[in-house]
Each structure stands twice: as C-alpha cells, then as structure tokens.
Amino acid sequence: GYRPYHQTLTIAGALDLGELLLTEETKELSAVQVTGRRPIMLRKADRMVFDATQIAPAASSALDVLRQTPGVNVSDGGISLIGKGGVIVLINDKRVRLSGSALISLLRSYPQSDLQEIQILTTPPAKYEAEGNAGVLNIILKKAKNDFFGGSIAPRFRLRKDKILYSLTSNLNYKKDKVTASLQLGGGSSGYDGRLDTYRTYPKQGTFHSSETAYSGQGPYFNLRAGLDYAFTPELSMGASISYSPEKGNSRRENDSRDYRILSSKAYELLRLLPGVADETDKSQYTTANVHLEKSFKSAPKRSLSWDADYVGYRSQEGRNFTSRGLMPNGTPIPGSDFHFDALTDQHTDSYITSLDYTEPIGKGTLSFGAKGTWTRTTNRSDYDAKSSMGERHDKITFDEHVYALYADFKHPLSDKWNLRTGLRMEYTHTAGENNGRRLEHLRSYLNIFPTLFLGFNPNDRHAFSLNGTVRLNRPHFGQLSPFADYENQYSIMRGKEDLRAAKRAKLALGYTFLGALDFQLDGGYLWDGITQVIRLDPVTNQGSITHDNAEKTWTFGLENSFFFNKVSFFQTYISQRLWYSDMKIGPESTSLYGGAGLTYHVSLNNTFFFNRSKTFQGTCSFYYRTPSYDGGFHMGHVISGGAGLSYTLLQGKLRLALDAYNLLRNNLRLNITTPDYEMYANNENSALTLNLGVTYSFGAPIRGKSERKSAQELRSRM
C-alpha cells in the first residue's frame, strides 16, 4: 500500500495537479499462521506418499524420519522395505549414488524441517532404473523460497550403551533471481557394538562347535554437498552438484571358539578352546558429481527435456589382523593349532553415467522416453602378509560393466474414472574383467526387458481400485564380485563370485483405497537368481564356506492393509500390517541346499500426540512386531521393537528441540539353518537402547535489493 497523501488546494478555476507521487508503505508482519491439516498418508497412482512433517514430528534428521516411516527398514547396510527387499533412494527425483554408511551419513545431514514428503514407489515408471527389487524411495524436499538466504544448524548427541556420539550438520540455501545455491556440511562420530554367537551341530559325527563374538567400533565421518543452479530463462536451467563423504573406523572383535564331543548321554565334552582377538581399521570415501540441464516449453507446459551426467567414485581400504591360540580344556597350549593373519583389502570403483529424458504431451496424456549409459570399472585387491597362517598371498581382480538402457512410458486417462500408465525398459549389460592378469572368459553379456503396468479405477471420491505389475532387478554390489578368500577365523571363510548376475523379481498387485485412509493390497511375486550368501559346512573340519551366489528362488503371496486415523485434534495414528506366505529355496541352479516355507505376519503402529492447540509440543511412539519368517534361507525368529519421542518448537518455529529413544522394546534376533548333515543357529544382538537429543535452529531472511530498502523508497518519492 501507500502512505496517506494530503495537500491543501485553493481552486480558482481549472487546475493541473501534475504527477502525484505516493510513498510506498510496507508493514512487516511478525508471523502469519495458517491452520490446516494435510493427510499423513496418501495413495497416488504409482506411489504411497507420507507427509514428512507429521509421520515423525520428533525426528531430528531425514534418517530419523525414515526410521519411523511405516514399512521402511534402516540399517548400517542401507535402506529396504520390510518383507520386500532393497530400494534405490532418490532426493527430489534424482538418484543418490551412495550406499551403506555413506548414504546413512548423507541422510543424517538433512534436518527434518527440510523434508516435505516421503514417497514409496513399488511400481515405479520405466524412466527409473530397474534396480531396487522392492522399488524406489523418493525424498521430496521443501522448495527453496524466492529471494531468500538462510539455513539451519543442528547439533545432536546420541547415547548408545557406554558410547556418547555426536554430530553437527549445517545447511545454507540461497535463491535470488536466476541463481539457486545450497551447501551442506556435516560431521560427527558413529559407533556400533553387539554380539554374534553361532553354534554348529553335526549329528553324524557327534560334534558340536560354538563361536561367540563380541564386537565394537567407532570412528569419525564427514560429508559435504554443494549445488548450484542457474535459470537462463524461465524455461531453461542448468545446474551442478558435488558431494564428498569420507569415513574412518576402528573396531575390535573378541572371539571365543570351542570344540565339543557329543556323548551318548547328550552331554557335551569340551575338547579344545580357541580364544582369538581381531583389530580392524577401515577408511572409505564416496565422491559424486552431477551436471544437469532442464528445458520446459511455454507453449506446451507438459513438454520437457532433461540431460544428466554423473560421476561416482568409491574408495575403500580395510586392514585386519586376527590371532587365536589352541588350548586344551586345562589351558595347555596345543602345538600347531595357532592361527594368525594380517590382511589388507581395498576396492576402487569409478562410474560414469549419462542420461537423456524427453516428455511429450499427447492429448490428455503424456509420452516419456529416454536413453541412458553407465560405464563402471571396479578393482578389488586382497593381500595377506608372509606371517599369515595361510601364507603370503596377493590377488587382484578388475571388473568392467557397461549398461545401456532405452525406455518409454505412456500415461493417459481412459475416461473420467479409468487411468492407464504403462512402460517398457530395455537394458543391455556387457561385462568383462581380469583375475590376476587372466582374462575372465566366462563373463556374459545379456539383454533384459522390464515392463510396468498400472491401471486405476476411481468410481467416485470414496473408492479407488488399482492393478499394477512390474519386473525389477537387483545388481550385485561390486565388493561381492571379489572371489578371494576373506577369513573371519580359521572356521569361517567368505568369498564373492566374479560372474554374479543381477537378481530379478516380478510382482503383480491389486489394490483398494477407501476415503484415502483405509488401504488394502493383494500381491504375488517371484524372485529368481537372488543374490545371497550360500553356507556350506564341512562336518569333518567344521570349516564353513560362505559364498555370494545367484542361489535364491522365492515365491511370495501377501495381503497388506494400512489405516490412517486423525478424527480427533490431539491424536493421530497410522497402522500397517501384512500377512504373507513365502516359499524359499537356497541352492545353485536347480539344487536346494536349505530354505523353507511358511506364513509371516508383521504389524507396525506410528502414533502422534499433540499436547497443545498450536501443535508445537508433540510426542510420538512406534511399535513393530514380526512373527518368525524365512530370509536368505535362514529361519528367523520373531522381531519386536519400539520407540518414543518428544519435540517442542519455539521462537515462531525457528528453534526445535527433539528427544527420542530407539529400541525401547527390542529382542535379539535368532537364525537357524537345518540340513541332513548339520544344523546351525545364530544369535545376533545389535539392537541396543539408543537415546538421541537434537537441537535445530533455522535462520534466514528475504534478500532485499536496493529498490526495496526504505531509504531508497523515500528518495524515489522525492524524484
């Protein structure tokens, strides 16, 4: 608006007032509060969408939000969907080319306040890579404000058993005219501890062997990510981003192995003790870079063209030593039974990726198509020094993988009530390599076709039906391609396989949603060439060979249900449950070494409580339970977990305090395998009670140009 203007005039005839210049008047509002409620869960054509601000209001980071997202499992190894498998992770529709601890560290750097949605695409369009046998997880960030500079800083402290861990993340965002920029810096300490106890019984030999291991580790990590976008015109923009994530760690394992004879009375007679200690140091780093170009068309809003070029580099080095002594039950050393090794393994991976995507409107629908190429080289080295019990060894394998892809997606409404989306993706994979200078002749090149289908029927606003099907794959990690022996102790040797193929999964699902809050899904699927660790035990020597192989074949049929309730102002809850039958066989080609079939049920509850009318004081509690199931050939015992959290927001939303606890309810996971020759079971303890305290302070202000300043306004009013 403008300031009031007053002028006293004496009118004695015609009068020309000339130009009347009014002075602009601005009034800065301290805060504007808009009260409303978005649904916490929304099912769209090909995805389930969760409101990130509501699903985990007490969370501190994107990682904490994913921990509390129904159906999502977060571990040190990455992100997966419970009962369905691994996913690829996107941020704002762009793939995050990190995995393992580097991915976990990156997700820690995003504060919860920056997140808008968590999207789970179990039937993603053909545009997305066929990897991720359970689909795609897309994290949508809030859009940058126009003419704004600001960010956030978030210190966090975590207490896990006797370890106090810390982290500090900071974010800066800038948007002015044609320039958008962001910078993320984060670092801290990570730590873990637990126990893994395994027990092997050989009935025919009458022997029993136990191996009980306690482990702990800790180390620093750091991550940096920077992005810059420039809009040449409203329809043409170009940008680039880089990230760098180094990490170090030191760990220690204390192992107590024992050999027994099973007497006729079923009692165990101790024959030998083999106490051992291992110290490990590892360091790794991810480096990524991206350049992208995006073009839209004013004459056709749905038409778009985009180009991306990426580089991904990974370096990993692990130093390990292990020493054990053989002792009689009375503690007397056993000559020739000592075992020792000093080993160094490293992995170098470089990937270069480029893609071109185009979308064209066709009537009420759209046609998308594109091409992509990926060129990757991986080098794995394994070295054991001369003092090792197995002798001096030096091995090197180089593996090249080239993937070329073409895809087409078509989306069109068939009527006011029917919608169709279908797609086809073709990927050609060429592989080559050398093992210690010898060319790998048995590697194969192959062509895969991946169809996708979605058919939706919405008779009215209350009901929605869907039918969708897809075929997806899961490529092996490059570390799984190393065939060299990796000793844990004298009884356990792990290996990869140089000619591992991608695992494939086909899935068909029928869904129904009522009022956007009650959802049912009936699905069936088949996994073949599944990549798993095949365990073979020698009953005579008790030596176990654990090898990555395309050895899993699994049929799955399930019924899934979810319900969202928010009919009262102080409470909301999301309930998800699934009942499925699986038939799993583990064994190369047509053989079956072990596995099993049976029903499994899981249920998860995510509850949010609002303790005041403004909803600035909130609490959450979550619960998860799963009955015994089969996974990777193991029969796994039941799983129970639960957590709770509190958050309080003040200073008009700028300061946020959060306290949450994971594994308030928890149990150790028990696994077992039974074959005609042996039985092995394990007890895995790694779910310790963890307390997190986080503080997030957000800052920022509009960027005012000279024409916006009051002094400039007053001067202009005088001209």
Model regions: which residues?
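Short, acidic, small-residue-rich periplasmic hinge/interaction motif at the N-terminus
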Residues: 3, 12-56, 74-76, 82-86, ...
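N-terminal periplasmic accessory domains that precede
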Residues: 18-21, 62-65, 103-106, 120, ...
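Short acidic/polar hinge/loop motifs at secondary-structure boundaries
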Residues: 62, 95-122
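Extracytoplasmic beta-strand/coil segments of soluble accessory domains associated
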Residues: 63-99
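Transmembrane beta-barrel wall of Gram-negative outer-membrane proteins
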Residues: 163-195, 206-253, 281-289, 453, ...
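Face-selective signature of the C-terminal outer-membrane beta-barrel domain
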Residues: 225-247, 278-435, 458-462, 516-522, ...
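Outer-membrane beta-barrel signature, preferentially recognizing the C-terminal barrel domain
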Residues: 345, 398-399, 473-521, 526, ...
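Gram-negative outer-membrane beta-barrel transporters
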Residues: 550-626
